[in-house]
A protein has these predicted regions:
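Solvent-exposed functional surfaces
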Residues: 133, 137-139, 143-202
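Short, charged/polar connector segments at secondary-structure boundaries
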Residues: 1-109, 115, 126, 171-182
Length: 202
């Protein structure tokens, strides 16, 4: 039955929940509104329809639904809930014709937070989707001297040229090196072929 999938997903959610509790971390989805409380956002940039790396979708925009999911987006509510029924119906839809309605999400520091479509993300992650289509708004923080912020601003420059969001660096200069590696001049835009070749190689 379709609830079998839900029960499997629930077990995965419960495992993640227990692991987080054991590490002293929150056992629920991250909430972007909470993260932004002390952040100065200087711009909102609509990115349009984006292929979002599933592993970069880490939370939800508002706190409304965040306790329904573990941090890995697996469900935590019991199988006899309306939530479980809706989740199972999405499974049906995914297996029959695929889930095509893009989610709505916010990007902050190259991580993504869902405004609409938490259950879709949950089902797609359960089926190990690599990318999830979403209409994305980027929230740009004020510049500061932290390493994370400086790397992010390098990413913003790179994204303008490459439109690639699945490469992460932990040191400064990585994106400029990557631009050279793809045989592009500083400031030169990538073509669709560049993107295809790179994703195949990556």
């Amino acid at each position: 039955s379709m609830l079998e999938d839900y029960k499997n997903a629930l077990r995965a959610g419960q495992r993640a929940y227990r692991a987080c509790v054991a590490r002293g971390q929150s056992p629920y989805l991250a909430v972007l509104d909470d993260i932004l409380v002390n952040v100065d956002i200087v711009a909102q940039e609509p990115l349009g329809l984006v292929e979002i790396p599933a592993e970069s979708i880490v939370g939800t925009k508002t706190s409304g639904r965040h306790t329904a999911f573990a941090p890995n987006f697996m469900p935590l509510l019991e199988p006899d809930t309306e939530f479980a029924v809706k989740w199972s119906n999405l499974c049906d839809a995914h297996l029959e014709e695929g889930i095509h309605t893009p989610i709505i999400a916010f990007e902050f520091m190259n991580k993504f937070y869902v405004q609409e479509g938490n259950k879709r993300v949950s089902v797609l992650k359960y089926y190990e989707a690599v990318k999830i289509a979403g209409t994305v708004t980027r929230l740009i923080p004020k510049r500061n001297d932290s390493l994370e912020n400086r790397i992010y601003y390098e990413f913003l420059d790179f994204y303008k040229l490459a439109k690639i969001n699945y490469v992460h660096f932990s040191k400064l200069g990585g994106y400029a090196k990557l631009q050279k590696l793809v045989c592009k001049a500083t400031g030169e835009n990538w073509t669709d072929d560049d993107r295809l070749n790179f994703s195949a190689f990556y």
